[in-house]
Design a protein with these regions (language model features):
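Flavin-dependent oxidoreductases
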Residues: 99, 106-205
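C-terminal catalytic lobe of FAD-dependent flavoproteins
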Residues: 213, 219-291
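Short, conserved active-site loop motifs that form the nucleotide-linked donor/cofactor pocket
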Residues: 39, 87-89, 288-289
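Short beta-strand to alpha-helix junction loop
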Residues: 14-23, 60-79, 231-241
């Protein structure tokens, strides 16, 4: 309908030990409860027919998983917004200066609306505070670094390869993702970033850092997961350690098979107690809605 590239390619979730094998069964049950069909638990002989280079004790096959070009999704949504009527606009590179219940002042003019919906991502908490919303949470940025498989190594991955999530940690773990266009990404890690939009390892912003480190939830997260966090930082600066993590599922992968890729920032919503808020938090404040 919208001519956006996508592919339902399927995914395997790989258990590498007995403990993960038990969680894999629970994962399958959760998927079936949520309406997924065709889920299968596969032994090594079976899952190697799908991903010959993967090693593990068991895998969950998720045939309905797929990939899509998210940039094209965003562009198509923008087109649809613009086509609603002559007053519909998509305005980019625009800073919010101030606002009240019906008026929002920005770097590109003042706009009036009966309702304002804020989806500010990394800055959603600051926008909410500007709107006099009292929060018991804060956004803390975590950078995820990726590597990519070289052209010669792409044949090692056919579809999507994921680890079994560890419920003790608020991060998924490194995985192999085939992208629309042919690239295969490996990662990410998860490291605290000293700038909310800090896509580089050396990025720093004093305001962002002070706000994050003066928040009780940040320190409680650090204390609860200090060992995990330390290992993530080591991997951020060591290609060989990053590779070692990938080799847990694909031992045949070599250091020359991976090259540095892109980075992304996760806008992690943390409660005052240091617990990660896993779902969207939607707050209504008079006529405004904050996500």
């Amino acid at each position: 309908e919208n001519k956006i590239d996508f592919e339902v390619c399927g995914k395997i979730v790989v258990a590498i030990n007995k403990e993960e094998e038990e969680r894999l069964i629970q994962l399958k049950n959760n998927g079936e409860k949520n309406g997924l069909t065709g889920l299968q638990l596969l032994n090594p002989e079976e899952f190697k027919k799908i991903e010959p280079n993967v090693e593990g004790v068991q895998a969950l096959w998720v045939p309905e998983s797929g990939i899509i070009d998210y940039k094209e999704v965003a562009n198509k949504l923008a087109e649809k917004v613009k086509s609603i009527n002559n007053s519909s606009e998509v305005i980019t590179n625009c800073e919010v200066k101030n606002y009240n219940n019906s008026e929002i002042k920005t770097s590109k003019g003042t706009f009036k609306a009966n309702h304002i919906i804020f989806c500010g991502g990394l800055f959603s908490d600051r926008l909410a505070v500007k709107d006099n919303v009292k929060l018991n949470m804060q956004i803390v940025g975590f950078r995820g670094d990726y590597y990519e498989l070289t052209e010669q190594a792409k044949s090692k991955v056919n579809n999507l390869i994921y680890p079994v999530p560890n419920p003790e940690f608020p991060f998924l773990g490194v995985h192999f993702t085939r992208m629309i266009g042919g690239k295969i990404e490996c990662g990410p890690n998860a490291v605290f970033t000293f700038k909310r939009e800090g896509y580089s390892k050396t990025d720093f912003n004093l305001k962002d850092t002070l706000q994050a480190l003066s928040f009780s939830g940040t320190w409680r997260l650090f204390i609860n997961h200090w060992k995990f966090g330390l290992n993530e930082y080591k991997r951020a600066f060591s290609k060989s350690l990053f590779l070692k993590e990938l080799q847990k599922m694909m031992p045949s992968l070599k250091i020359e098979d991976i090259v540095v890729g892109r980075s992304g920032i996760r806008a992690m919503a943390l409660g005052n107690d240091g617990e990660v808020i896993d779902d969207f938090k939607i707050i209504k404040n008079k006529k405004n809605i904050h996500v």
